[in-house]
C-alpha cells in the first residue's frame, strides 16, 4: 500500500464521514426524505468498498452492517426512527475513531461488536425477508437528435436512476453531462436490485429518449482498482479546476517569503543611510510585487470556517440528548474564510463555548415551557468578516448569565470587594468569568463547570491577537463574540522605543501620537490619568510595564494613544522609529500562558529582534 493511496483513502473517508453526519442530521428532521436515505446509503456503500479494498476489514464490516440497515430503509421495509438514527450516529463515531487510528499508523481496530449487534437487531433477523439481490448494469442511453435540452434530459435520467440504486460511474462524467459536453448518448453504471425491464421502463418514460440498452456486468474483483479509479477521477477533476497542495509546502514557501521581507527591510535601511534614490525607487516597485506575492500566498492558506464548524451539529445533538434538552444549532457564514493557522487555534475554544451554551445556557424543556419559551432552544453560530478580522459569535436564547451570582462568587474568591462590585458595569462583571478557576455552576457537570475553561479560552484567543467579549440578559440568552485576525504572518506595525528597548505596536491598534506635559498627569486611586479629547484615559509608561527606567523626568512626554477591545489608553514612549511591515514569529515555549503581553517577535533590517505587543492584554 503506497503512501499516496493511504492519503487518498483518509481524504475520501473524511469526506464521506462528513457527508454521512450532515445527511443524518437532515434525515432526523425529515425522516421520509428518500433522497437523503439514498445519499446516506451511497456514502456507506462507497466507504465499505474503499475500506475492503485497502484491507481495513473492521471498517468494512461496520459499514457493511450499516449498509444492510440503510438498504432496508431505502426499500421502505424499515422506518426512520430516533433509535435508528442514534445507532447510525454511533456507527459514524466509531468510524471517525477508526479512521483516526488508521491515520496514525493503525489498522482501524475498535470494539464494534455491540454496535453491530444493535444494527442486526434493527433488521429483525427472525423474520424472513424476500430481499432482492443487487446487480450491476451498464446502461447506454441515447437522446433524440432533435432534442433541444440534451443536458436536462440526461440529468433527469441520472436522477431517476439514482433513486433506483447507486450510480458508480458515468461516461462522460457528471460535470460534462451537465455542461452538455457529449453528442447524443452517454453511459451509466448502476448497482440496483431492480430488473432490466424496470430500468428501461423508467428511462423510456422520460420524453425525448430514443433508445435504452441495459446490460448486466460481471463484477471483477481487483484489489486496488477502486482506489486507482477514485484517484483518476480526482485527478481529472483537479486538472479542470483546482490542485491540492499540502499545507507544509505552502508554509515552506511562506517562510522563504518572510525571509525576503526581512532582507527587504535591511536593504531599506541601507537605502535610507546612503540616500540612494534610485535604489529607493526600485525598492518601491519591489514592495508592490512583494505585496502581490504575499496576498497570493495568504489566499492559498485561507480555508472556510466550515472546516471547524462542521463538527458541531453532531456534537450539539449528542450533548443535548445526554442532558435531556432540545436544541437547534443554526450555522451562518460557514463559507467565511480565515488563515488555516488561525483555524487550527480556534477549534478548542469554540468547542468549550458551545458546550457551555448547551450545558449552562440552554434550559430543559420543562423550564423553557414554564418561562413561556419554545421548548427547543436555539444556538446560533455565526461567522463574518469585519475589516481585517473575522468575527465569530455564539448566540443562545437560554437562561442568560446571573450577574448577582457572578458578583457573589467574585467577592467570595476575593477577586473584587463588595464596594467595588457596586460600581461595576455589565461588561466588567461578565469579564470576571474569564478569571482563572472562576465558575458559577451550582454543581460540577461532565461537560463544563469545572472552572478551568473560559480563562484558557481567553488566553488562546489573546495569543493569536484576538479578543473575546460577552453580552447577556437574564432569561433572554447570551452572546460570546470572538474577533480574530484574518492572518498571523505579516502585519503592519509602528516601531517605538522606550528607555532601553524597541517594541512593535500593531498599527490597527494605534489612534495617534501626541505630546503631553508631565504636569497634566493626574494620580487617582493608584492610576495615572489624563484628559484626552474630553475623555479621561489611563496612561502607562511602556518601559516601566517591563521593569525599565521610567521616562517621567522629562519636560515633555511622547504619548502613543492606542485602543483595544475594552478601552482607549496612552503609552508613554521615548521615540517613534517609524511604520514597518513585519513578519510575526511565534514565541513558542519562551513565554508561559500567563505572560501573554506579546503576540510574537520579529527581526528588523539591522538584525535586531523586537517583541510585538499584544495590546488586548493591557
UniProtKB/Swiss-Prot annotation:
<dbReference type="Pfam" id="PF02895">
    <property type="entry name" value="H-kinase_dim"/>
</dbReference>
<dbReference type="InterPro" id="IPR037006">
    <property type="entry name" value="CheA-like_homodim_sf"/>
</dbReference>
<dbReference type="InterPro" id="IPR008207">
    <property type="entry name" value="Sig_transdc_His_kin_Hpt_dom"/>
</dbReference>
<dbReference type="InterPro" id="IPR004358">
    <property type="entry name" value="Sig_transdc_His_kin-like_C"/>
</dbReference>
<keyword id="KW-0902">Two-component regulatory system</keyword>
<dbReference type="InterPro" id="IPR002545">
    <property type="entry name" value="CheW-lke_dom"/>
</dbReference>
<dbReference type="Pfam" id="PF02518">
    <property type="entry name" value="HATPase_c"/>
</dbReference>
<protein>
    <recommendedName>
        <fullName>Chemotaxis protein CheA</fullName>
        <ecNumber>2.7.13.3</ecNumber>
    </recommendedName>
</protein>
<dbReference type="GO" id="GO:0000155">
    <property type="term" value="F:phosphorelay sensor kinase activity"/>
</dbReference>
<comment type="function">
    <text>Involved in the transmission of sensory signals from the chemoreceptors to the flagellar motors. CheA is autophosphorylated; it can transfer its phosphate group to either CheB or CheY.</text>
</comment>
<keyword id="KW-0597">Phosphoprotein</keyword>
<dbReference type="InterPro" id="IPR037052">
    <property type="entry name" value="CheA-like_P2_sf"/>
</dbReference>
<feature type="modified residue" description="Phosphohistidine; by autocatalysis">
    <location>
        <position position="45"/>
    </location>
</feature>
<dbReference type="InterPro" id="IPR004105">
    <property type="entry name" value="CheA-like_dim"/>
</dbReference>
<dbReference type="GO" id="GO:0005737">
    <property type="term" value="C:cytoplasm"/>
</dbReference>
<dbReference type="InterPro" id="IPR051315">
    <property type="entry name" value="Bact_Chemotaxis_CheA"/>
</dbReference>
<dbReference type="InterPro" id="IPR036061">
    <property type="entry name" value="CheW-like_dom_sf"/>
</dbReference>
<keyword id="KW-0418">Kinase</keyword>
<dbReference type="Pfam" id="PF01627">
    <property type="entry name" value="Hpt"/>
</dbReference>
<feature type="domain" description="CheW-like">
    <location>
        <begin position="490"/>
        <end position="618"/>
    </location>
</feature>
<dbReference type="InterPro" id="IPR035891">
    <property type="entry name" value="CheY-binding_CheA"/>
</dbReference>
<dbReference type="Pfam" id="PF01584">
    <property type="entry name" value="CheW"/>
</dbReference>
<dbReference type="Pfam" id="PF07194">
    <property type="entry name" value="P2"/>
</dbReference>
<dbReference type="InterPro" id="IPR005467">
    <property type="entry name" value="His_kinase_dom"/>
</dbReference>
<dbReference type="GO" id="GO:0006935">
    <property type="term" value="P:chemotaxis"/>
</dbReference>
<keyword id="KW-0067">ATP-binding</keyword>
<keyword id="KW-0547">Nucleotide-binding</keyword>
<keyword id="KW-0963">Cytoplasm</keyword>
<keyword id="KW-0145">Chemotaxis</keyword>
<dbReference type="InterPro" id="IPR036097">
    <property type="entry name" value="HisK_dim/P_sf"/>
</dbReference>
<dbReference type="InterPro" id="IPR036641">
    <property type="entry name" value="HPT_dom_sf"/>
</dbReference>
<keyword id="KW-0808">Transferase</keyword>
<feature type="domain" description="Histidine kinase">
    <location>
        <begin position="233"/>
        <end position="488"/>
    </location>
</feature>
<dbReference type="InterPro" id="IPR010808">
    <property type="entry name" value="CheA_P2-bd"/>
</dbReference>
<dbReference type="InterPro" id="IPR036890">
    <property type="entry name" value="HATPase_C_sf"/>
</dbReference>
<dbReference type="GO" id="GO:0005524">
    <property type="term" value="F:ATP binding"/>
</dbReference>
<feature type="domain" description="HPt">
    <location>
        <begin position="1"/>
        <end position="102"/>
    </location>
</feature>
